[in-house]
């Protein structure tokens, strides 16, 4: 997967809420999001009052395809805990990195802290 992107929940929310960096995320589309990050995005949208089906449709309209979180990615995400915990990365963050590494893709995030350690994949931080 060259020139492919795996989106972190923060990048998808940035796009959907038209925040600073949304144009960059839009240029990365179509892209994928891992199931863990997808769950985070749905949770935030539902928390803000959006219906679950509407949230799902909104993500689909943006050409963001959810990918299952499998055993191999789970193992890699778990192994990243020791190097990323002190930086505050969540399970969703580590799951995104693991998926990007597995796909040979770039992880696109709004969290600059991802550039503070040696990630298993290329990382592009928007802010």
Please identify what each model-predicted range represents:
Residues 12-13, 38, 114-115:
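A generic structural signal for short hydrophobic patches within well-formed alpha-helices
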Residues 66-106:
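Active-site neighborhoods of divalent-metal-dependent phosphate/nucleic-acid chemistry enzymes
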Residues 30-33, 62-66, 106:
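Short loop->beta-strand "edge-of-pocket" segments that line small-molecule binding or catalytic clefts
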Residues 22, 38, 74-77:
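A general structural signal for well-ordered alpha-helical segments in protein cores
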Residues 26, 42-43, 59, 78-81:
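Amphipathic alpha-helical segments within well-ordered protein domains
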Residues 2, 97, 101-127:
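Acidic, PIN/NYN-like endoribonuclease modules and their adjacent C-terminal/linker elements
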Residues 1-33, 45-57, 127:
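Short, well-structured N-terminal submotif of metal-dependent ribonuclease cores
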């Amino acid at each position: 997967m060259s020139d492919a992107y795996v989106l972190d929940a923060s990048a998808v929310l940035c796009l959907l809420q038209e925040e600073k960096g949304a144009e960059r995320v839009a240029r990365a589309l179509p892209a994928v999001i891992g199931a863990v990050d997808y769950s985070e995005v749905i949770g935030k949208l539902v928390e803000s009052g959006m219906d679950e089906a509407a949230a799902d449709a909104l993500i689909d309209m943006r050409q963001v395809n959810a990918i299952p979180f499998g055993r191999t990615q789970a193992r890699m995400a778990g192994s990243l805990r020791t190097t990323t915990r002190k930086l505050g990365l969540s399970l969703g963050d580590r799951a995104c990195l693991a998926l990007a590494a597995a796909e040979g893709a770039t992880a696109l995030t709004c969290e600059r802290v991802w550039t503070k350690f040696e990630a298993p994949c290329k990382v592009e931080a928007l802010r």
